[in-house]
Amino acid sequence: TIADKVTIDGRFIDLKRYSEEETKVLMLNKQAGVICSNKDEEGRKSVFDFLPENTRWVMVGRLDLNSAGLLLFTNNGDLANKLMHPSSEIDREYAVRVLGRVSDEDIKQLISGIELEDGFAKFHKVTIGGGDGANRWYHVVVREGRKREVRRLWEALDFKVSRLIRTRFSDIRMPDNLRANQSELLKPKQVQSLLNSVNLLP
């Protein structure tokens, strides 16, 4: 636009070069056993090993060592902070494989809430995902990013989580064809949707 083009002392200046960097968001399909820290004394693989190196990426939340699935990274620190803040109430959906027979009463309790050591927590939604025998899959939604929150809610009712995979963050779903430890940039309209969800301008 004309506003982006000015002349100073007869020299053409492109203001776009000096404007704030365009917001980028990257999704990664984290594999279980990969850490979310930048450095590790044990030499284990980090999620940062699988990211493009030409950008300073900020991780949006984290997944524990034994969890897998969708992780988001952005070059916009404000966006990362707002997406992580509990007041934003952003949906995080997980596929969870649970060992043990879960009753309707158990599900009601998980939705109504349980007092954990760091305060009250609950699932906003629980749906059955299938499975046979003692191991069954469930899809659960939380709106906070507390450490090991999904596992701790199940463990509070004496159930063991044998697998935990994040499948969705806000309205961003992990594509079926995104392989383990593979990353992919979000499309501009997906980035805009995330910015809108926390009332940030692009």
Predicted stretch roles:
Residues 1-202:
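Basic, flexible Lys/Arg- and Gly-enriched helix-loop patches that mediate nucleic-acid binding at interfaces
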